[in-house]
């Protein structure tokens, strides 16, 4: 049995995620690590309860606990590197309000590597926890991380602006940072959904286009230069240009990949397997190379390939600042890029166009591995004469000779299978997507009938 997926532990409250589990994870972290642990939480209704259980587990092992309380995940990672030997974040990121979860960080701000997560699971399942003597149990110390974190981002970005920016915080923890960061940069900030509320009353927390499409109209009505949207724990960023057009996540990645490769005169960019061909096109043209890695492991890719930049959809890592996903650095650098090079609508014209479609197929967790394998094998047979490369990390990514690709992978956080297709034309994309989606849907039904 696995507790950790591609983004830590995540699941529905009381079904998978409970105070008992949080306490055991805390006990396991305190057994695996020693010294100080920085603990934070997002704004979900269950996060205070789970944070307190986590703290109890950590204290029981003798660790000293620093309580950052309500904080965005990137700020928790930064604070861990500055203050502690380990970090723990109570969050379910962009999941529905019924869910919650746990992310664990090393003292350098990296998320726990897969082998470390397996180590925690072994400790939890064995019950072999360290138990502190009565005189080893330390008091909890409350710490304020956010002001110093904002200053660190400001220093790193090193730019002042007079842009007008619309910010949508998804009623999440990012609302404690982004409006203040942008204002300190000199921007005129207009905010929506910027009060923290674990019910997520403004919109669904995931910043997919369908959840934030209304921002395009607001951009045009308010005359802003840029709109930024985040998720519940503020590790994701989505953007609209000054004309109200949504800038898809691969284009944002491609803009930054191009920037870093040009600055370095080459270098390696690591991206997750669900990213598109436009990234390869701009990186190779600029003299760099792209390496695709499993989902949830950009920090591992940075270390393994000495990467100058890493990204997943909506999640960008700026290694010079830190080895964690940091959208606050992203928004600061994006504003700098716009000020120095022109409107975002013009910048994206430098990125080649590919057409992407994605959807989820509901699938019970126990069938996901079989369904993904069978569906990928069937799609490979149908496209055998066109295949350029097949990557079998975090699922199956089937790349074709014309630059098209199909991805079939199990979700690491939900009972779903992700299906993605991208191609140079909409017609080709639709053909590939329909083939993959219908194949996965049929095999799920067959598996459920067994």
Swiss-Prot record:
Pfam families: PGM_PMM_I, PGM_PMM_II, PGM_PMM_III, PGM_PMM_IV. PROSITE patterns: PGM_PMM (PS00710). Keywords: Isomerase, Magnesium, Metal-binding, Phosphoprotein. Mg(2+) binds at residues 93, 231, 233, 235. Can also use Ni(2+), Mn(2+) and Zn(2+), to a lower extent. The modification Phosphoserine is found at residue 93. GO terms for molecular function: magnesium ion binding; phosphoglucosamine mutase activity; phosphomannomutase activity; phosphopentomutase activity. The active site is at 93 (phosphoserine intermediate). NCBIfam families: Arch_GlmM. Homotetramer. This is Phosphopentomutase. It comes from Thermococcus kodakarensis (strain ATCC BAA-918 / JCM 12380 / KOD1).
